[in-house]
Amino acid sequence: MAVNKGYTGYNKELNAMAATHAYIRLSTLMSQIESWQATRASVLTHLGVMLNGVSKLGERSFFSRTKRFGAHTSDGDEIFCDLGGEAVTQILSRLTVALQSARGEGAQTRNAKRGAAPGTSQVENEEQGQTDQTLAISNAVAELMIFVRTKDFTMNECYTQDSFEAKYNLKWEGSS
């Protein structure tokens, strides 16, 4: 008799986690953050690309009752990170807010109320604001890089296939 492939021990909590948490290879996450750090000098010209990258970071529905965690890898030793943990979610939210602010989301409404051409002091303030925005983005990217290198993140939010299944008491039945 053939055994249907899938997890035993899979439950509602894991189903919700699979739907709401994004997972990403640790190597891909590090490369992406390094790429964002490299754009530091021209970050304001790459806002849309960075914002899109942050919003699409990782993959949801990475596993399910019938889809094995990390199954699309050639071996089970590759490390995947959960981007749905509270700390990393807060850091990514701060980065998103910094990018949205620098992009001017909300500024169009404020500027429309002015109605007059900007004066010299207003232009100087806007130039200072751009410097502040660049600094806020750079700080948020640096904070993310520092965090993903911490033992707390790598030990609690990063998994191989075996460590994920052991943590959540999952047993894969059938062939992968």
From Swiss-Prot:
Highest taxon of the lineage: Viruses
Any single Gene Ontology cellular-component annotation: helical viral capsid
Keyword field contains Lipid metabolism: no
Gene3D superfamilies cross-referenced by the UniProt entry: Tobacco mosaic virus-like, coat protein
A Pfam family annotated for this UniProt entry: TMV_coat
Entry keyword set: Capsid protein, Helical capsid protein, Virion
Principal location: virion
Family: Belongs to the virgaviridae capsid protein family.
Job description of the protein: Capsid protein self-assembles to form rod-shaped virions about 20 nm in diameter with a central canal enclosing the viral genomic RNA. Isoform N-CP does not seem to be required for virion formation and systemic infection in host plant.
Record-given protein name: Capsid protein
